[in-house]
Regions:
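Conserved S-adenosyl-L-methionine
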Residues: 22-182
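Long, low-complexity, polar/charged, intrinsically disordered or flexibly structured peripheral segments
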Residues: 194-247
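Disulfide-bonded cysteines in secreted/extracellular proteins and peptides
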Residues: 70, 188, 209-212
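Short, surface-exposed amphipathic charged segments that create phosphate/polyanion-binding patches used
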Residues: 182-198
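C-terminal intrinsically disordered extensions
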Residues: 14, 175-180, 214, 219-222
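A short N-terminal interaction module
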Residues: 1-13, 17-26
């Protein structure tokens, strides 16, 4: 199956729509533009982001964002154009995480608090992907996003322990999953049951995975995916988060 790449400007337009609703105001981070050659792009708003009454930047950092079938996770971070492969400067990035980090950079100066809220930002974004190669690239992009933003802010590389902490969060929040089954891809199997009659004749009976047979995500015999509930500091099955369980 071929990978489908959503152009970065479409990702930006859709994320802008989400932020327009959250802020109650349009085009706070950037505005869509059409270049002379007909290419659709965006122009970054360089002014500090202002928050509406009743909300603040910490609320924005904590707000959960989730990219399904994320591929290389262009909605989470936009280090490069999805169709051009051109590197995008930090100030012009448009992903969910990019915007959260921008807000942190605008409101935090001290390293300790920057790391604290950056960790929270990483814990607030989620994504799953069927294909392992795309998942690897997505995780890599998120980790590089942390390193690049840290260097941009403090003009030095982050400590290994800080990189490892973010890498651990990424390993939980971006995972490999069959989104229709909520299990690790291709982990469901048919079982063989052998029955023997009184004459010692044996018959092999193939038993299908009931979840696959009945298209019920709660009945699969594959390996169910787990994610981390960071507030409770415990793991939970992703399938248990679905509504109307068992219906």
């Amino acid at each position: 199956m071929a990978e489908i790449y959503t152009p970065s400007w479409i990702c930006n337009a859709q994320i802008n729509s989400i932020d327009n609703g959250w802020f109650g105001k349009e085009n706070l981070f950037n505005i869509q533009v059409t270049l002379k050659d007909g290419t659709v792009s965006w122009k970054t708003n360089d002014k500090k982001i202002k928050f509406p009454k009743g909300k603040n930047w910490k609320d924005y950092i904590a707000d959960i964002r989730f990219e399904v079938t994320c591929g290389e996770a262009p909605y989470l971070t936009s280090r490069y154009g999805t169709t051009t492969w051109e590197y995008i400067q930090i100030k012009n990035r448009i992903g969910f995480l990019d915007r959260k980090l921008r807000v942190i950079n605008e409101n935090i100066k001290k390293r300790y608090y920057w790391l604290k809220y950056t960790e929270q930002a990483f814990k607030s974004i989620y994504g799953y992907e069927f294909h392992g190669d795309s998942l690897l690239l997505a995780r890599e992009s998120l980790l590089y996003t942390f390193i690049e933003n840290y260097y941009e802010k403090f003009l030095e590389e982050p400590k290994l322990e800080d990189i490892q902490n973010i890498a651990n969060i990424i390993s939980w929040n971006l995972w490999q999953m069959d989104g229709l089954k909520c299990v690790i891809p291709n982990s469901c199997t048919d079982k063989i049951r052998i029955e023997q009659d009184i004459f010692d004749n044996t018959t092999k009976i193939n038993i299908e995975c009931q979840g696959c047979k009945k298209n019920n995500p709660y009945l699969h015999n594959g390996i169910y995916c787990t994610i981390m509930d960071w507030e409770e500091n415990k793991t939970i099955k992703f399938v248990d988060m679905l509504e109307n369980k068992g219906n």
